[in-house]
Structures are given as structure tokens and as C-alpha cells.
């Protein structure tokens, strides 16, 4: 059975996190709780972050698992965490929108590409950071599904 890559339940608005670790764990836990990945995927998200930061600029980070994490992915999916106050991702990089990604097979590349296109428009990012409802974020990222 196919699941939507992004659904309302994958979005957390007005999150308050203490640090990057807590933010990544939350992004992964949403994917676990909604049936996209196994628990072990979260460890692989931390491994990826240790290799290289997933901070992308424009207040966005896109944490995802390492190449060998695919075995823990049940369905492709993304989680969105809005952090209006921001969280430090190191080197002075502040993240206000965290997009956790899990891709089955090589689907993560297509998902990343679509997200990159949407997020290259600063207005889209600002709208998602200020969004009052999950629907506002869904409407901007609807082409990811």
C-alpha cells in the first residue's frame, strides 16, 4: 500500500527544541511514529549529520539517513518541523525549518530535488516558517507528494 510522502500528521508547528540533536531526533521520531521508518533510521540520521551538516542555507536543514539506512525505510516520507525561534546547527547556522527525509530505494533524490526547488524561493521558506496551520505548509509542498 502506498502512503503519501507528506501528510498533515508529519508536520509539527511552533516546535521548541534545545539543540540540533533534539531537532533531528524529533524529525526522525515523526517518521517512525507515522510508519515510514524503523527506529534504527534515527541513528543513521545522526551518522549522516556527523559526516557533514545537513544545513542547506535559508534557515533550512534536511536531515536524512546515510546510504546504508535504506534497509530501515518502509515508505518514502518527509517530516516538517517549524522552529520559529530557531535552533543552532553549528557555525552560526540557525535553522527554523527542519525537513526530515526518508527515501525508499533512490526516491530520496527526487524528493530532495523537489524540496530544493520549492525552498530556493525565499518567500516559500518564509511562508512555511510563519505558517499558522499545517495546510499552509502542505499547499507549498504539495508537489512533493
Curated annotation (Swiss-Prot):
Residue ranges occupied by any PTS EIIA type-2 domain in the UniProt entry: 4-144
GO BP annotations listed: phosphoenolpyruvate-dependent sugar phosphotransferase system
Pfam families: PTS_EIIA_2 (PF00359)
Phosphohistidine carried by residues: 64
GO MF annotations in UniProt: kinase activity; protein-phosphocysteine-sugar phosphotransferase activity
N-terminal signal peptide: none
UniProt entry tagged with the keyword Kinase: yes
Gene3D superfamilies, alphabetized: Mannitol-specific EII, Chain A
Keywords linked to the UniProt accession: Cytoplasm, Kinase, Phosphoprotein, Phosphotransferase system, Sugar transport, Transferase, Transport
Disulfide topology: none
Compartments, record wording: Cytoplasm
Major location category of this protein: cytoplasm
InterPro entries: PTrfase/Anion_transptr, PTS_EIIA_type-2_dom, Sugar_PTS
Entry annotation: catalytic residues: 64 (tele-phosphohistidine intermediate)
Purpose of the protein: The phosphoenolpyruvate-dependent sugar phosphotransferase system (sugar PTS), a major carbohydrate active transport system, catalyzes the phosphorylation of incoming sugar substrates concomitantly with their translocation across the cell membrane. The enzyme II CmtAB PTS system is involved in D-mannitol transport.
Domain comment (free text): The PTS EIIA type-2 domain is phosphorylated by phospho-HPr on a histidyl residue. Then, it transfers the phosphoryl group to the PTS EIIB type-2 domain.
Name the UniProt record assigns to this protein: Mannitol-specific phosphotransferase enzyme IIA component
Lineage: Bacteria, Bacillati, Bacillota, Bacilli, Bacillales
Amino acid at each position: 500500500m502506498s502512503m503519501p510522502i507528506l501528510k498533515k500528521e508529519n508536520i509539527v508547528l511552533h516546535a521548541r527544541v534545545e539543540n540540533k540533536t533534539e531537532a533531528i531526533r524529533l524529525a526522525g521520531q515523526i517518521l517512525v511514529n507515522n510508519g515510514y521508518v524503523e527506529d534504527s533510521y534515527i541513528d543513521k540520521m545522526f551518522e549522516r549529520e556527523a559526516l557533514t551538516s545537513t544545513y542547506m542555507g535559508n534557515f533550512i536543514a534536511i536531515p536524512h539517513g546515510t546510504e546504508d539506512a535504506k534497509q530501515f525505510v518502509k515508505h518514502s516520507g518527509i517530516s516538517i518541523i517549524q522552529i520559529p525561534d530557531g535552533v543552532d546547527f553549528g557555525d552560526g547556522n540557525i535553522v527554523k525549518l527542519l525537513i526530515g527525509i526518508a527515501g525508499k530505494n533512490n526516491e530520496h533524490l527526487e524528493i530532495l530535488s523537489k524540496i530544493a526547488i520549492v525552498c530556493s524561493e525565499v518567500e516559500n521558506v518564509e511562508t512555511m516558517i510563519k505558517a499558522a496551520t499545517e495546510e499552509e505548509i502542505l499547499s507549498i509542498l504539495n508537489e512533493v507528494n
